[in-house]
Every structure is written in C-alpha cells, then in structure tokens.
Amino acid sequence: MKWYLDFGHGGKDPGAVGKNGTKESDVVLKIGMCVKHLLEKANETVVTTRTSDTYLPLSYRTNKANKENCDYFISFHMNSFTNLAKGCEVWVYNSNSKLYLLGNNIVFNLSKALNTPNRGVKTSKSFYVLKHTKMPALLIEIDFISNPVVESVCLSDAYIKTTSYTIASTLLAFVNKKL
C-alpha cells in the first residue's frame, strides 16, 4: 500500500493553539512522523505532506497526493472548541466512503487507548482535503487541544507513542497487515 499522511497546518498556520501555547501543527507532526515510521517498519510506502514546521497550502497537499498515486490519504488534526470538550472523531467525504469503516475503527481504538470519548465518524463535503483527493481520504481529529488536560499531555512521549501506535496498527489492520 502507498499511504499519504497529511500533517495538518504548519509554519505560519499553527492550527488550533491550546491555552498554554501548544500548537496543533507541532502535535500532529510528531504523531504523524511516528505513524510514518511504524508503517515503514511494516514495509508500507509512505509519502508525507511535510517533515518540519512548514506551511503548505491545501491545494499543494492534495495535488501531491494525487500525483503520487497514493492508495489512501490520512489527514491528522487536533480539535478545538470549549475547554471542556474532549474526544476523537473522524471525517469522511460521505458515508458510502470506502474509509467509513476504517474511520469507525480509528475512533473506537483511539477512544479506548486515550481514554477519551468516541465522537464517531462524520461526513462533510466542505473539507478541502477530502473533496480534492482522488483516493479514499479521511481526516482524524485526535482529541481537543483546547482541553487543558489533553494539552498538558499531548506532547508527552507516552501520548505520542500510544496515539501513533494505535493509528498505525488500525491502518495496517484495515489492509490485513500487522505491526
């Protein structure tokens, strides 16, 4: 399989920022790079949007994925709302998407591993990266960086390791492989 991993935001666009200054772009880059290494250990081919804190427009992200002829597009994000909001969710373009089942598996496994609510799989035709990719695509909102408890742990080695292992093993199980 050839996976395209899109680590949301970057550079001049930090994405959501927690009250203590933790940037979504930093968290998803760390988690995403760990997922990349785990997938590569399982002999998967992985293309990434970025490997550093760099701003790249949405059109660049989808064009690169389409040119690389990747099998799947996975976008990593942290959510933001009120400081009490908590939970993981996955977005797909429509409920008939090939990745709807994968999305269900991701939120189920992440909610268990991170002890956070399962907010389910949702559909949206307005997310640029879901709309403009030629391959099946999904967007993971790992948890709420706006929640002080989540923000306090989301850059810890344990959180990054648990999250990346859970995502990578779920992706591999979807294509009948193991870590």
Predicted regions and their residues:
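Active-site-proximal helix/loop segments of hydrolytic enzymes
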Residues: S25-L179
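Extreme N-terminal starter segment of soluble prokaryotic enzymes
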Residues: M1-W3
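Short acidic/polar micro-motifs centered on Gly/Asp/Asn
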Residues: D6-D13
